[in-house]
Amino acid sequence: MGKEKFERKKPHVNIGTIGHIDHGKTTLTAAITKVANLKSGGKFISYDEIDKAPEEKERGITIATSHVEYETDKRHYAHVDCPGHADYIKNMITGAAQMDGGILVVAATDGPMPQTREHILLARQVGVPQLVVFLNKCDLVDDEELLELVELEVRELLSSYDFPGDDVPVIRGSALKALESDDPNSAEAKCILDLLDACDSFIPEPVRDIDKPFLMPIEDVFSISGRGTVVTGRVERGVIKVGEEVEIVGIKPTVKTTCTGVEMFRKLLDQGEAGDNIGALLRGTKRDDVERGQVLAAPKSITPHKKFKAEVYVLSKEEGGRHTPFFTGYRPQFYFRTTDITGVISLPEGVEMVMPGDNSQFIVELIAPIAMEAGLRFAIREGGRTVGSGVVTEINE
């Protein structure tokens, strides 16, 4: 059996379930795969298969995640579900599972709970564009007014974190009843189809990497006598065409140059695009003007910064992290894309220290500027080992 060819007829969207423990995230994930696949003839994955999520390593951090996929008439979805609360935090901060949108699961029997709030905040911090809400276990609540009240509470909570609480679709239903039904057109399964419709219409289609402005982290620099300087790396986004102007950004003052050649596997190309490992020949650039850790980027598309706010997960001792807490003034290395840069941490007012296993927000000031924008991921390292993982939430200067 050869590998099935992935047919790219529909837009691809990455999505995931978030919400408080035992509110039904995994049951909903199973119900969606069942109903969607009964409708489109795909493969159903049971609750138990999803629940025994395999552990994956992302930047040295172990995260248990389940991946399922399903289709609607309009889209192909890749869906992540995590068994434990800590897995969600790690997943969202490391970007192990990039989310173009999320399904917030709230049990109508409980209403919003502490983790509901924490997941909404994290979604906001790491830049998940939109959420839709599934109000679960509605079959266990007889009182229509109570459902109205829970829905209102969820909408207000979303608004308080800058999601459009008044406009977010809220679908009511029972994931368990939908999962028990074998007919996708049954009354029990209708809530799942409504939820998928809401995802199709409310979660924006992601901009493909190739359609974004060009950026390539520089991994290596060579000089080729008579031709100039070649920088190599993997194109992160966009397209670079021979003859185009690019900027070298980060560490040193930004300089402009022209790309006079692109090669891949020793063959000359007209262009390099997102995902390609290329060498780019730069006109008039000296070998010493460029170094690993800088980026090659479309002019004016990204700027270098030193000071930023971050949301960070600090590895526990068991994960190979620190054994002791750290305080304001802690100076580890921050690994951005291809290089380590030293930086100093300032904890927010009222936060005395950060313990291994915590997630926290704080300000970082690097000793040299790095090409950055909100949403950029980084690792925190100490003597070459990873002790934390973070995402830039706001740029200060």
Curated annotation (Swiss-Prot):
Residues 10-207 form the tr-type G domain. GTP binds at residues 19-26, 81-85, 136-139. Its EC number is 3.6.5.3. Residues 60-64 are annotated as: G2. It catalyses: GTP + H2O = GDP + phosphate + H(+). Keywords: Cytoplasm, Elongation factor, GTP-binding, Hydrolase, Magnesium, Metal-binding, Nucleotide-binding, Protein biosynthesis. Residues 81-84 are annotated as: G3. Its main location: cytoplasm. One of its GO terms (molecular function) is GTP binding. It is found in: Cytoplasm. PROSITE patterns: G_TR_1 (PS00301), G_TR_2 (PS51722). Residues 136-139 are annotated as: G4. GO terms for cellular component: cytosol. Residues 19-26 are annotated as: G1. InterPro entries: EF-Tu_GTP-bd, EF-Tu_GTPase, EFTu-like_2, EFTU_2, G_TR_CS, P-loop_NTPase, Small_GTP-bd, T_Tr_GTP-bd_dom. Residues 174-176 are annotated as: G5. The keyword Protein biosynthesis applies. The keyword DNA-binding does not apply. Mg(2+) binds at T26. PANTHER family: ELONGATION FACTOR TU, MITOCHONDRIAL (PTHR43721:SF22), ELONGATION FACTOR TU-RELATED (PTHR43721). GTP hydrolase that promotes the GTP-dependent binding of aminoacyl-tRNA to the A-site of ribosomes during protein biosynthesis. Monomer. Belongs to the TRAFAC class translation factor GTPase superfamily. Classic translation factor GTPase family. EF-Tu/EF-1A subfamily. This is Elongation factor Tu. It comes from Desulfovibrio desulfuricans (strain ATCC 27774 / DSM 6949 / MB). The gene is tuf.
